[in-house]
Amino acid sequence: MSTNEQLAWDFDDGDVAEVRPDTGIARFAPGSEQWIAALQPTDDDAIRLDRFDVNTMTAEAAARLWARVAAWVESDQIAYYIDDSPVSSDAAYDARMRCLERLEAAFPSLDNPQSPTHRVGGSFSNDFVSVRHPSRMMSLDDVFSIEELKDWYDSVIRDLDWPESKPLPMSCEVKIDGLALNLIYRNGVLEQGLTRGDGVTGEDITLNVRTIGSIPANLGGPKEDVPDFVEIRGEVFMRWDDFHTLNNEQEDAGRAPFANPRNAAAGSLRQKDPRITATRRLSFYAHGLGQLTWGADHPRGTHDVVADQSQAYDLYTRWGVPVSPHNRAVTSFQEILDMIEYYGEHRGDIEHALDGIVVKVDDLGLQRTLGATSRAPRWAIAYKYPPEEVNTELLNITVQVGRTGRVTPVAVLKPVYVAGSTVARTTLHNGFEVKRKGVLIGDTVVVRKAGDVIPELVGPVLERRKGREDQLREFVMPEFCPSCGAKLAPAKEGDKDIRCPNVESCPAQLTERVISLASRKAFDIEHLGEQSAIALTNPEENRPDSVATYAPNITEVLVAPGEEPDPYEPVEGLELPAAQKPVLSNESGLFDLTAADLRDVRVWREAAIVEVHETVGANGKKKKVRKRVGGSGLWHQVPAFWTAPTPAKKLTAKQLAERAQREAAIESAETQGGAASETTGAPTGAEAPLGTMPGFAAASYPEYDVPADAVIVRVDHKTTRTGVTDVPVIIRPGENTRKMFDEMDKARHADLWRVLVALSIRRLGPPTARLIASAMGSLAAIEKATIEDLTAIDGVGPEIAESVVNWFAATREPGDWRGATLRAWQAAGVGVDEAETSSLPQTLAGKTVVVTGSLEGYSRDSAKEAIIERGGKAAGSVSKKTDYVVIGANAGSKAIKAEELGIPMLGEIQFAQLLETGSID
């Protein structure tokens, strides 16, 4: 293409766009590597793509062009469908899409289900496919004391044979409490975003990564600074101010707040719908490099031009990739201690949560000399701050009842901020533990977070008791269940735990069982969470004790900053509504539920106190800022599963015409003896509604949008300039309710092991349920199994076998709730499918593997499941029969025993290799 050539296209509106000839790309032959690298996401280059004949390309060049254009199209789709702020013209977007389609037609290997050409409209979702990292993404070893840190520092000096008198450059940075992320850029274009996973493979969360504003879609800076390929490692996190804003929004919407910023970031980053992630205000800081390739034709050449961490940070800055401002270059151990001391005192003063200081050898050449273990580099270490301890008041000790009837004392604390989140409650495990700690209700107590995660009540501050003895009282475990009133007792002699024996109908136990059966470890009914479970089993939870705190029309109390709410005076004659009966009295009716059954279920919500003040926005205009500051103690009821009454939307003339057209198509199809095609679509309201109030028929209001599942509850008379108009007011199942029923339908065909877990059989978890389901093959066979049959299965112990046999024996007792549940579920199609055989290669057949310690890429259960799925036995103890022991962080006595017995010990990387190949050779 000559530099004088002009290209143009006609847009739909007749305008013409011309390519400016001074872009530099015209110097290169179309389709060449230089031409592909010079392409930019501009309208000009989109025209070039539209005119380019892809059939002249080699397969390798086509793959490079496809990757570049696909990334731009995906960014365009996210900007349009998710962010609602298009960045490209429709014509440019269409041209790029046509280019992809031509490439995929000419080179079929490029056509894959993840291609943007297969995405319809705004149907974005993440499948979280596992992808191999181009280079291993390691974790860091932790140390918890200055002595351990000094040992590491001395070992680095010793291994490098570094002269004592010569300063060793190191870099120190705060350890962000977030999620590790690997960003892959090819020719400066963001290609993929991967979670750490097990360090060898991670989950592809590219769609969600593209919604994070601080992560550039294209690397900036001069072309000579942009490599052919680079992996940028960093941390996704949520700033404190964004975290508090999100939690206010959660509470305003009646949803549970997140415990801490890390949980919020993790939950946001792993959303299947990236539109949700886009609203969560996530941030990113880069802190490391993976693979870096400049390419033979690159101005920098093929040599490694990044010599140390400081140069890497300089590159990030030029590329537009953010780095943490909280880092220092140091040359002595004392300077490292200074950094640790400073941020230990200022943990709450920076923009994000932190849980330690990372120390790295600065020089990349020295890093390579030091090398790495199977899971972590030897040239870096993470110093973890000791658990933060604070004092607060023990207001009360209550008890909670779990799904198996276990009654646990819970400390109710004066809310206190500790290690990244507010703590108001923490478990005390059992009555013996309360006595051992020696705490009294009313004590000032010490609270910390074990591992900076789990709140723990350490004990009382005895000095604070002086002069207050008459205000303190001892906790006594209750004699009767606080939920159902049944007499409490240990399950057997010698048990420390006491239990509620009313397994069938204790509301607290039933609620916990429903939460459990809907969890990911069982039926995986995502939209049947804690609040929905409470609404189904105990809708009167939080019912006010008297009318004095019943405020049916108050959903929030507005106050000025620093003001207290006015006293509440109930309306004269106000009475509490009649108590509701729960929809579920046990699990048997779960799969028989319909949306109509849930129409009148209402739950209690506390009105929030909202502080409102005026401020001036960036545009100079006044705006009101709202902040939730607490609960008011006033309660009202809200629909749990259906929407509140809402006026139906009036259809436009165009919408009415489209509906008439669809109805005509359906009528025509029915007349011809067929059914309307799926593409024609049934009109809104085509199905019979669940029911309407007497006298209110949807057909009477054809000009309004009344969905098929909606109910008209009343008709409002609206006065307009043309007279009085009747507006139907409707209710319908909420979006989450509709999703819940869809997920329940899928759960009818859940794997057999999931059904076993959902039955809440004591001691039976997913790994053992998988073993039993795989060996027995059907629910009918498991029902008939003896203890001997089950213990004959490798990995099933006598206690679990006894629990399973006893549970199914109870189902045969007349009137037993477990039998009713089992028969009702089977009638609904649950558990009637045969157990599925694992489709994974049986790489571990005949091998016994023990997992100990914490793994980055696996929970304890998921690691065991990975072993079992591949034919292996996931044992709980180390013996001479053990083939391998997988060692994670904080491994205990099992690692010592494995070493004594000479059993191969694997890191997480080797574990991944073992799963894949069955060998570590």
Curated annotation (Swiss-Prot):
- Where along the chain is the active site annotated? K175 (n6-amp-lysine intermediate)
Give its E.C. classification number: 6.5.1.2
- Known catalysed reaction(s)? NAD(+) + (deoxyribonucleotide)n-3'-hydroxyl + 5'-phospho-(deoxyribonucleotide)m = (deoxyribonucleotide)n+m + AMP + beta-nicotinamide D-nucleotide
Q: Is Oxidoreductase set as a keyword in this record?
A: no
Q: Which domain of life is it from?
A: Bacteria
- Known cofactor(s): Mg(2+); Mn(2+)
Domain BRCT: where?
839-921
Q: Does the keyword Nucleotide-binding apply?
A: no
Binding-site residues, NAD(+): D90, A91, A92, Y93, D94, S139, L140, E173, R196, E235, K360, K384
Which Gene Ontology cellular component terms are annotated?
Answer: cytosol
Q: Which is a GO BP term held by this UniProt record?
A: DNA repair
What EC class does the entry list?
ligase
Q: Which GO terms describe its molecular function?
A: DNA ligase (NAD+) activity; metal ion binding
For the region Disordered, give the residue spans: 663-688
The record's listing under SUPFAM superfamilies reads: BRCT domain, DNA ligase/mRNA capping enzyme, catalytic domain, Nucleic acid-binding proteins, RuvA domain 2-like
Q: Which PANTHER family match?
A: CHROMOSOME TRANSMISSION FIDELITY FACTOR 18, DNA LIGASE
Q: Which HAMAP family match?
A: DNA_ligase_A
Q: What does this protein do?
A: DNA ligase that catalyzes the formation of phosphodiester linkages between 5'-phosphoryl and 3'-hydroxyl groups in double-stranded DNA using NAD as a coenzyme and as the energy source for the reaction. It is essential for DNA replication and repair of damaged DNA.
Cross-referenced NCBIfam families: dnlj (TIGR00575), PRK07956.1 (NF005932)
Q: What is the protein name for this chain?
A: DNA ligase
Q: Could you tell me the gene encoding this protein?
A: ligA
